[in-house]
A protein has these predicted regions:
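Short helix-capping/linker turns of helical repeat alpha-solenoids
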Residues: 30-33, 61-67, 76-78, 97-99, ...
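TPR/TPR-like alpha-solenoid helical repeat scaffolds
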Residues: 104-112, 145-153, 225-228, 253-273, ...
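Structural motif corresponding to the intra-repeat A-B loop/turn of tetratricopeptide repeats
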Residues: 46, 81, 124, 160-162, ...
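Hydrophobic face of amphipathic alpha-helices that form TPR/SEL1-like repeat modules
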Residues: 41-43, 67, 72-76, 94, ...
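TPR/TPR-like (Sel1-like) alpha-helical repeat modules
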Residues: 92-94, 132, 137-138, 231-249, ...
Length: 321
C-alpha cells in the first residue's frame, strides 16, 4: 500500500507541476511579464536548473529577481559550470541598483556578496568589505532585512582578531529575536561562558534547550557536555547516542538544509556527542561498560572533527573529564 501511495503522491505532484506550467504558458501568451520569472522559479524549485537558467537569462534585463537568481546559480554552479566572478557581478548589480523594484532583494544580495568577499571567492578577499556588506544587509536588526547577515555578524565578531564579544552578543541577540536558530545556540554559549554578557547559567540552559529542541545539533552537543559534567550520566548517554548516531554523510547536509545551521557546527555537535558517548561507554557511566563500542564512537569523533577530539582527549589526560 505504501508503494502505491508513493506513486499516487508522485504522479499528483507531477500533474500539479504540469498544470502550473500550462497556466504560466497561457499567462505568458496573454502578455503577463511576471509569468516568465514564475516559470523560471518553478523550474528552479523542481531542480531543472538548465531550464531555469535559460529562462532567467532571457528576462534578466527586465526582471531584478531573475538577475538575483542568476547570481546564485552562477556562484553555486547550478545548471552551469561554476563561475563565481559572474555570480558576484550579478549580486553587485542588485546591491548597486537604484531601482525601487530591486530594494527587496538588496539585503539578501548584500549578504551573499559579503560571503564572497569574506571567502575571497569570485572577488579579492576583504574582511572590511564583508563586514560593510553584512552591516548593510543586517539593517540594524530589521526583521525584514537579512537575518542570516545578523547571525553571521555575531559569528564574525566572536571569531575575528581581536574579538568584539559585545558586538557579537548584540548581533546574535538580534538574529535570535528574528528567529535564527544558529544564533539561539550561540547566545546560549555566550551566556554560559560570560562572553560579551554577564554569565547566566539559567539563561544559557534556556537558550540551549530551546535551540536543541528546534534541531540545533551544536546546541545538542553542548548540552551533552553539560549533562556529563553535571554527572547526569543516564541523561547524557540517551541524548548523546541519538546525536552520535546521525549519519555523517547524509544527515549533515539534510540537517543544514532544514535548520539553516552551518554544516561545520553540525559536525562539531555530532563530534562532541560521539566523544562523550564513548567516554560513558568506556567508564560504564549511565550504561553498561563496553570498551569495544566506545572505540567505535571515539573513532567517529576523530573522523568528524580531529581538532575537537584531540582537545577533548587532552582534557581526559588531565583528568578534567
Amino acid at each position: 500500500m505504501e508503494f502505491f501511495s508513493f506513486l499516487s503522491d508522485h504522479y499528483s505532484h507531477a500533474n500539479l507541476v504540469d498544470r502550473a506550467l500550462q497556466l504560466l504558458k497561457e499567462r505568458i501568451r496573454r502578455g503577463d511579464a511576471m509569468a516568465y520569472f514564475l516559470r523560471g522559479q518553478l523550474y528552479f524549485e523542481e531542480g531543472w536548473y538548465e531550464e531555469a537558467l535559460e529562462q532567467f537569462e532571457e528576462i534578466k534585463e527586465k526582471d531584478h529577481q531573475a538577475t538575483y537568481q542568476l547570481g546564485v546559480m552562477y556562484y553555486d554552479g547550478l545548471g552551469t559550470t561554476p563561475d563565481a566572478e559572474k555570480g558576484v557581478e550579478y549580486m553587485k548589480k542588485i546591491v548597486d541598483s537604484p531601482c525601487p523594484k530591486a530594494r527587496h532583494l538588496q539585503f539578501a544580495a548584500a549578504y551573499n556578496l559579503g560571503r564572497a568577499y569574506y571567502e575571497g571567492k569570485g572577488v579579492k578577499r576583504s574582511e572590511e568589505d564583508a563586514e560593510r556588506l553584512w552591516l548593510f544587509a543586517a539593517d540594524n536588526g530589521n526583521p525584514k532585512a537579512s537575518v542570516k547577515a545578523q547571525s553571521i555578524l555575531g559569528l564574525y565578531y566572536s571569531t575575528k582578531e581581536p574579538k568584539e564579544l559585545e558586538k557579537a552578543f548584540y548581533w546574535h541577540s538580534e538574529a535570535c529575536g528574528n528567529g535564527n536558530l544558529e544564533s539561539q545556540g550561540a547566545l546560549g554559549l555566550m551566556y554560559f561562558y560570560g562572553q560579551g554578557i554577564r554569565q547566566d547559567t539559567e539563561a544559557a540552559l534556556h537558550c540551549l534547550r530551546e535551540a536543541a529542541e528546534r534541531g540545533n545539533v551544536y546546541a545538542q552537543g553542548n548540552l551533552v557536555e553539560y549533562y556529563y559534567k553535571m554527572k547526569f550520566f543516564t541523561k547524557c548517554v540517551a541524548f548523546s547516542k541519538r546525536i552520535a548516531d546521525y549519519d555523517e554523510v547524509h544527515d549533515i547536509p539534510m540537517i543544514a538544509k532544514v535548520t539553516d545551521c552551518l554544516p561545520e557546527f553540525i559536525n562539531r555537535g555530532m563530534a562532541m556527542a560521539s566523544f562523550y558517548h564513548a567516554r560513558c561507554l568506556q567508564l560504564g557511566l549511565g550504561i553498561t561498560k563496553d570498551e569495544a563500542t566506545a572505540k567505535q564512537y571515539y573513532s567517529k569523533a576523530c573522523r568528524l572533527n580531529p581538532a575537537l577530539a584531540d582537545e577533548l582527549h587532552s582534557l581526559v589526560i588531565r583528568q578534567r573529564i
